Amino acid sequence: MDNRPIGFLDSGVGGLTVVRELMRQLPHESIVYVGDSARAPYGPRPADQIREFTWELVNFLLTKNVKMIVFACNTATAVAWEEVKNALSIPVLGVILPGSSAAIKSTTSGKVGVIGTPMTIQSDIYRQKIQLLAPQIEVLSLACPKFVPIVESNETKSSVAKKIVYETLEPLVGKVDTLVLGCTHYPLLRPIIQNVMGSEVTLIDSGAECIRDISVLLNYFQINASREEKKADNLFFTTAGTDTFKEIANAWLEESIDVEHTDL
């Protein structure tokens, strides 16, 4: 048994979509979450800068004595996950491989769409992972640079959000039967995305898919938290103002949380 928390990092609030799934499926595990909203979005930034920022988040989590780190950010996973995983002695998970595997299982037409930040799409990592496992699948990738700012400003239900999502996704409509939400911010736009793509298209939440991998690694390394002892409080940190983060988190997690500011 290991009652240390699991660390989550993201460029902002998007990783809360992963945390919500963990709280549902592994409620006895405690969490330390850090979101770099002050420097979001990561997607348009150069790879070296994303790598630098990611290491700052990792080092912050290490000061909190975490037993595992989850990259709840596709952009950070695409750029820095491999490097961090190889450098640390604790397990480090990314969200891209679980999302790719789920897309392969889902598609019946052999045509999968992937949406993500400019850096995630530019890295071509989803297409590579999917076609490594299933070379016959056609992958259509689309960068959606305006989606993260909508989520970070808590405008997901606005008419502007609907217009932007519709205009951005138009090139994929009718061309795929499965769409990977290749950014953990995007599930917060899920109702609009589903409406635009059509009810027949399966949406893959890459972040939620990684919870199964977290559970497997907890068992493998025998670092599950005790179900008998009272778990530590979940901790949430943001590099930006706490009010917007808290508003989004309370609505998404369906509970009131405390959020602290950090300058890393």
UniProtKB/Swiss-Prot annotation:
EC category: isomerase
GO biological process per UniProt: cell wall organization; peptidoglycan biosynthetic process; regulation of cell shape
UniProt protein name: Glutamate racemase
SUPFAM superfamilies attached to this UniProt entry: Aspartate/glutamate racemase (SSF53681)
NCBIfam families the UniProt entry points to: glut_race, PRK00865.1-3
GO molecular function: glutamate racemase activity
HAMAP family to which the protein is assigned, alphabetical: Glu_racemase
Species name: Streptococcus uberis (strain ATCC BAA-854 / 0140J)
Family affiliation: Belongs to the aspartate/glutamate racemases family.
Family annotation (Gene3D superfamilies): 3.40.50.1860
A Pfam family of this chain: Asp_Glu_race
Keyword Zinc-finger annotated: no
Highest taxon above the source species: Bacteria
UniProt keywords, alphabetically: Cell shape, Cell wall biogenesis/degradation, Isomerase, Peptidoglycan synthesis
Active site, per annotation: 73, 183
Function: Provides the (R)-glutamate required for cell wall biosynthesis.
EC number: 5.1.1.3
Catalytic reactions of this protein: L-glutamate = D-glutamate
Pathway(s): Cell wall biogenesis; peptidoglycan biosynthesis
Residues annotated as binding substrate: 10-11, 42-43, 74-75, 184-185
InterPro entries: Asp/Glu/hydantoin_racemase (IPR015942), Asp/Glu_race (IPR001920), Asp/Glu_racemase_AS_2 (IPR033134), Glu_race (IPR004391)
